[in-house]
């Protein structure tokens, strides 16, 4: 999704505002301020792109080891199983702190890898 999104921004189809404080969203208008200056714009849709930071504590409580530098859980890339037997990960969490590495296009295969590994065990 990110490559397509960035292309839409680059070609002026999507407007991005940084450091914006949203005051109100109506059915067809967004009211926000940046550095105290209020702005109103017509809109069809509003996306709050707030970023993503994984919650490592949840995985760590189950014994999953996390690389301190990258934030990546330790896992087998062929099966998506973590260092804890029977605990698998899928999607953007596999990228750790670099959420711009795994997208729908490449993360969608994680489920198949996990299912194949579980099927071998039953």
Swiss-Prot record:
Xref: Pfam families: Pyr_redox_3
Superkingdom as given in the UniProt entry: Bacteria
InterPro entries: FAD/NAD-bd_sf
SUPFAM superfamilies xrefs: FAD/NAD(P)-binding domain
Record-stated family: To B.subtilis YpdA.
Protein name: Uncharacterized protein in ansA 5'region
Species of provenance: Bacillus licheniformis
């Amino acid at each position: 999704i990110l490559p397509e999104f960035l292309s839409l921004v680059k070609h002026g189809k999507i407007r991005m505002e940084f450091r914006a404080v949203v005051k109100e969203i109506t059915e067809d208008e967004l009211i926000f301020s940046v550095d105290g200056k209020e702005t109103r714009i017509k809109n069809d849709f509003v996306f709050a792109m707030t970023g993503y930071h994984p919650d490592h504590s949840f995985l760590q409580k189950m014994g999953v080891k996390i690389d301190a530098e990258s934030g990546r859980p330790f896992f087998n890339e062929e099966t998506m199983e973590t260092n804890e037997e029977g605990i698998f990960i899928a999607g953007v969490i596999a990228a750790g702190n670099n959420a711009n590495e795994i997208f729908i296009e490449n993360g969608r295969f994680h489920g198949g890898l996990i299912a194949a590994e579980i099927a071998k065990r039953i």
